[in-house]
């Protein structure tokens, strides 16, 4: 009878003496070492991206890229890399980072030839796929196009005009609450109040149910969970870089490395959003001009989106439209308060334009050019989306900012590095709104290098809503109040964390900013 392979192996091993086993182990170790060295040498010298500059460790490993995401330092780390290596940097074995203004359109824009770039699978947003379906953020190109077309009506100018009353009601409440605090003559944490406002506003726009933050003057469990969802997503993305997507290793590392409370953040956010979305859908005849009202009233939107997709998109809109806007408004406040000449010109424009608060509307706030310039400059220096948004180059390759990049390469623009580069802006670290008003000193500025809402088919669908929200809140605040930063004591030290030339350099990013508190004093403008 023929011996099995197992029997032969056992007999062969029995014939080996200890010396032979030692030799075998040495041989295996040498072969593994040679293979690793060969792989390292190939990645450094022979890989299709070998011509692009970058640190040697980044060229051979995903570990540096993973680590800076997990620790919230990707934006500052990539800025240093671009300052050292130039406008294109190899930040991982198969990944390039760009800062040129043309790279935005080349990567994120509509492609003239071939398919648009797909979003990288390592990206994870505020909500994971459900029952095989995804929201607009994570959807592949074809499904994304269908969902975006269906949701476009929700964010049209016609819809925004109808939603104005909802947004104004929450700004009314913010102003009223701030007037109450003035009587107490104590510092106010503007960072929190902006968060309360954006959460209540988006809750009302998504589900016809505000979070209740403004009423109670504090964050709810749900609003806190939404803020932390970004951190959980960044940690998962960090793991995906080294462990792959949907692999056993990724699942194991998520279980071992991400705290259980982080999973609970996502759970609370999803469950609450799902419950409120279903309740709003069941009340379909309600004449409340929120997002779901417009979805149900528009035949194409209603027929194009499944119930699950509506739920997933409401989860996304709550997370994408709250803390991001609150962060920008807080940064904007810091910038105008630390630039007296900007503050005076801005308050003169707003207070000289309106005779009463009722005059501050969707139509009138569009006619405040200096306000728009200050917001654009704040969006440049303190973009709510400072992290790289990776895309995959289609098969066949593509030219990005003048460089041919092979297919299946991961690419992205580094937003924070781009806006801080002297290749794109004169005095890039300085807050100068005039650069957005045609000031000849900045004629060579590449304003397109600042894309806080991204661009192209996956650009922020809520850009117009966001701008109206920001203009409305800022106009109402400066029409009613004089704002000044607290500069002494513990609160003064906290405010220094916003200095982008100082401690602010160490502010962390988990997809969006992990913003610190900001303490201000308010005085009501006498009239």
Curated annotation (Swiss-Prot):
Heme binds at residue 460. It comes from the Eukaryota. Pathway: Hormone biosynthesis. Its cofactor is heme. Gene3D superfamilies: Cytochrome P450. It holds the Pfam family p450. Its EC number is 1.-.-.-. Disruption phenotype: Impairs the production of abscisic acid (ABA) and leads to the accumulation of 1'-deoxy-ABA. SUPFAM superfamilies: Cytochrome P450 (SSF48264). The chain crosses the membrane at residues 26-46. Keywords: Glycoprotein, Heme, Iron, Membrane, Metal-binding, Monooxygenase, Oxidoreductase, Transmembrane, Transmembrane helix, Virulence. Glycans are attached at residues 189, 420, 448, 464. GO terms for cellular component: membrane. It is a single-pass membrane protein. Its main location: membrane. It is found in: Membrane. GO terms for molecular function: heme binding; iron ion binding; monooxygenase activity; oxidoreductase activity, acting on paired donors, with incorporation or reduction of molecular oxygen. One of its GO terms (biological process) is abscisic acid biosynthetic process. InterPro entries: Cyt_P450, Cyt_P450_CS, Cyt_P450_E_grp-I, Cyt_P450_sf, Cytochrome_P450_monoxygenase. Induction: Expression is persistently induced 60 minutes after the addition of the ABA precursor mevalonic acid (MVA) to the medium. Belongs to the cytochrome P450 family. PANTHER family: CYTOCHROME P450 (PTHR24305), CYTOCHROME P450 MONOOXYGENASE ASQL-RELATED (PTHR24305:SF210). Cytochrome P450 monooxygenase; part of the gene cluster that mediates the biosynthesis of abscisic acid (ABA), a phytohormone that acts antagonistically toward salicylic acid (SA), jasmonic acid (JA) and ethylene (ETH) signaling, to impede plant defense responses. The first step of the pathway catalyzes the reaction from farnesyl diphosphate to alpha-ionylideneethane performed by the alpha-ionylideneethane synthase aba3 via a three-step reaction mechanism involving 2 neutral intermediates, beta-farnesene and allofarnesene. This is Cytochrome P450 monooxygenase aba2. It comes from Botryotinia fuckeliana (strain B05.10). The lineage of its organism: Eukaryota, Fungi, Dikarya, Ascomycota, Pezizomycotina. The gene is aba2.
């Amino acid at each position: 009878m023929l011996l099995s392979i197992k029997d032969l192996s056992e007999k062969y091993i029995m014939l080996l003496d200890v010396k032979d086993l030692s030799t075998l182990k040495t041989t295996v170790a040498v072969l593994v070492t040679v293979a690793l060295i060969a792989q390292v040498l190939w990645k450094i010298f022979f890989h299709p991206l070998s011509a692009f500059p970058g640190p040697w460790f980044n060229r051979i490993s995903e570990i540096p890229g993973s680590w800076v995401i997990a620790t919230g330092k990707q934006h500052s780390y990539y800025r240093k890399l671009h300052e050292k290596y130039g406008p294109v940097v190899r930040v991982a074995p198969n990944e390039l980072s760009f800062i040129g203004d043309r790279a935005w359109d080349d990567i994120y824009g509509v492609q003239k030839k071939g398919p648009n770039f797909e979003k990288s699978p390592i990206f994870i947003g505020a909500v994971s796929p459900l029952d095989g379906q995804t929201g607009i953020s994570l959807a592949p190109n074809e499904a994304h196009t269908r969902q975006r077309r269906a949701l476009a009506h929700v964010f049209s100018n016609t819809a925004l005009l109808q939603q104005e009353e909802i947004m104004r009601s929450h700004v009314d409440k913010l102003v009223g609450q701030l007037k109450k605090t003035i009587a107490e003559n104590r510092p106010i944490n503007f960072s929190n109040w902006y968060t309360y406002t954006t959460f209540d506003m988006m809750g009302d726009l998504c589900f016809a149910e505000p979070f209740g933050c403004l009423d109670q003057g504090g964050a709810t469990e749900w609003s806190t969970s939404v803020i932390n969802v970004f951190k959980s997503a960044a940690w998962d993305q960090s793991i995906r870089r080294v462990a792959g997507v949907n692999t056993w290793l990724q699942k194991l590392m998520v279980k071992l490395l991400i705290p259980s409370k982080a999973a609970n953040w996502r759970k609370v956010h999803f469950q609450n959003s799902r419950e409120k979305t279903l309740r709003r859908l069941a009340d379909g005849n309600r004449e409340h001009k929120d997002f779901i009202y417009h979805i149900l009233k528009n035949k194409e939107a209603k027929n194009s989106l499944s119930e699950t997709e509506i739920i997933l998109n409401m989860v996304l809109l709550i997370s994408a439209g709250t803390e991001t806007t609150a962060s920008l408004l807080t940064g904007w406040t810091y910038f105008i308060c630390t630039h007296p000449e900007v503050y005076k010109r801005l308050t003169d424009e707003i207070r000289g334009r309106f005779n009463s608060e009722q005059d501050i509307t969707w139509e009138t706030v569009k006619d405040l050019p200096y306000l728009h310039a200050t917001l654009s400059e704040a969006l440049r220096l303190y973009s709510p989306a400072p992290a790289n948004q990776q895309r995959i180059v289609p098969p066949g390759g593509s030219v990005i900012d003048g460089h041919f990049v092979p297919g299946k390469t991961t690419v992205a623009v580094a937003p924070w590095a781009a806006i801080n580069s002297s290749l794109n802006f004169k005095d890039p670290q300085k807050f100068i709104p005039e650069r957005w008003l045609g000031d000849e000193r900045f004629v060579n500025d590449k304003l397109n290098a600042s894309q806080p809402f991204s661009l192209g088919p996956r650009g922020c669908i809520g850009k117009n809503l966001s701008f109206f929200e920001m203009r409305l809140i800022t106009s109402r605040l400066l029409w009613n109040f004089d704002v000044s930063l607290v500069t002494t004591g513990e609160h003064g030290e906290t405010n220094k964390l916003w200095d982008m030339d100082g401690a602010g350099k160490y502010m962390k990013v988990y997809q969006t900013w992990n913003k610190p508190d900001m303490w201000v004093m308010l005085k009501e403008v006498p009239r």
